[in-house]
Amino acid sequence: MPELPEVETSRRGIEPHLVGATILHAVVRNERLRWPVSPEIHALSDQPVLSVQRRAKYLLLELPAGWIIIHLGMSGSLRVLPEDLPAAKHDHVDLVMSNGKVLRYTDPRRFGAWLWCTDLDASSVLSHLGPEPLSDSFSASYLFEKSRGKRTAVKPWLMDNKVVVGVGNIYASESLFVAGILPDRPAMALSEAEAGLLVSTIKGVLMRSIEQGGTTLRDFLQSDGKPGYFAQELQVYGRAGEPCRKCAMPIESSKHGQRSTFFCRRCQK
């Protein structure tokens, strides 16, 4: 599933091609995504793109009439292509632009979303979200106070969007390894120093992944069709049985909340 770095990579890739151009119309080939494509998107006509923003794993296209909210789901990607390039089997939505380009949404599993909203503060998919991990709001004091009394294992706790947004399975595993914290420790067991270390580690891991264009494990592609290269730098995720890059002890895996977790028992405490 595309996580925050992949969504931010997509945002940065499409922004120069959209802002200042006008959406002439939308082409919806299959509206049956996680939720049906909003009827307002079907009816789009002559709407200039004012900005391309991101909140958590949602891309937000600001138009004079409202906002398009895009979620990439499990397997979605966005590419900027020539308008005359024929659509393929899993190309479900196009935004045809005034500059001769098209923003094309591809999603083999169809678990993404294209929604319409006139007031972001009232959006049901955005209103409950916690702070952005790269913002000043996500601080050592915030994370430490938030963890008090929480018996939940720290890894699934970090993946709760009410705690912090955009830290999915890959980056939670990687950040906990770099911080030296076992993923099954209760969140309430974090010391204030460990909370600070974890915050700085999460920020660093996410920023490094964004610099590398995200992580491509299966379906994710950047807006130019290239894969993300952070997969080559993964320390523990997907490496069960392989030697730890620090101590050579085999990487272990376990299940937390139906998701695989990867860690080094020697390097993490």
Curated annotation (Swiss-Prot):
The keyword Hydrolase applies. It catalyses: Hydrolysis of DNA containing ring-opened 7-methylguanine residues, releasing 2,6-diamino-4-hydroxy-5-(N-methyl)formamidopyrimidine; 2'-deoxyribonucleotide-(2'-deoxyribose 5'-phosphate)-2'-deoxyribonucleotide-DNA = a 3'-end 2'-deoxyribonucleotide-(2,3-dehydro-2,3-deoxyribose 5'-phosphate)-DNA + a 5'-end 5'-phospho-2'-deoxyribonucleoside-DNA + H(+). GO terms for biological process: base-excision repair. NCBIfam families: fpg, PRK01103.1. One of its GO terms (molecular function) is zinc ion binding. Involved in base excision repair of DNA damaged by oxidation or by mutagenic agents. Acts as a DNA glycosylase that recognizes and removes damaged bases. Has a preference for oxidized purines, such as 7,8-dihydro-8-oxoguanine (8-oxoG). Has AP (apurinic/apyrimidinic) lyase activity and introduces nicks in the DNA strand. Cleaves the DNA backbone by beta-delta elimination to generate a single-strand break at the site of the removed base with both 3'- and 5'-phosphates. This is Formamidopyrimidine-DNA glycosylase. It comes from Erwinia tasmaniensis (strain DSM 17950 / CFBP 7177 / CIP 109463 / NCPPB 4357 / Et1/99). Belongs to the FPG family. Monomer. DNA binds at H90, R109, K150. Signal peptide: none annotated. A zinc finger (FPG-type) spans 235-269. The keyword DNA repair applies. Its cofactor is Zn(2+). Binds 1 zinc ion per subunit. Its EC number is 3.2.2.23, 4.2.99.18. Keywords: DNA damage, DNA repair, DNA-binding, Glycosidase, Hydrolase, Lyase, Metal-binding, Multifunctional enzyme, Zinc, Zinc-finger. HAMAP family: Fapy_DNA_glycosyl. InterPro entries: DNA_glyclase/AP_lyase_DNA-bd, DNA_glyclase_Znf_dom_DNA_BS, Formamido-pyr_DNA_Glyclase, FPG_cat, MutM-like_N-ter, Ribosomal_uS13-like_H2TH, Znf_DNA_glyclase/AP_lyase, Znf_FPG/IleRS. The active site is at P2, E3, K57, R259.
